[in-house]
Amino acid sequence: MLEGSCHCGAVRLTLPFAPEVATSCNCSLCRRLGGTLAYYEFGTVKIEGHPESTAEYIWGDRTLRTIHCKTCACVTHWEPLDPAPGAKHGVNLANFEPSLLASVRVRRFDGADTWKFIDE
């Protein structure tokens, strides 16, 4: 089991498997949050403490909600506002043991300008 949590432990996440790749994005939100995200099919990540211990931030084109703990403010994940078949979760790997992130290939995504990966 790959288990992680926000700093205070109110929001707990369990991943269905270790990611092979994660993304570091430089869009106006991600660069401020500083997270590295791995993506999973919506509904496959076990999230405890959500929604009772979380708050959300919705901005831009209003298709995603960024979720953070109400108590410690750690961003745990994002999820689609209207999940369609094939929808994804973006899970912040900073909430897991550092060894998980160290084992994952991190790709750099230019969400600020080109909307393309910039590490190819």
Annotate the PLM regions.
Residues 1-5, 10-120:
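A short Gly-Trp-Pro
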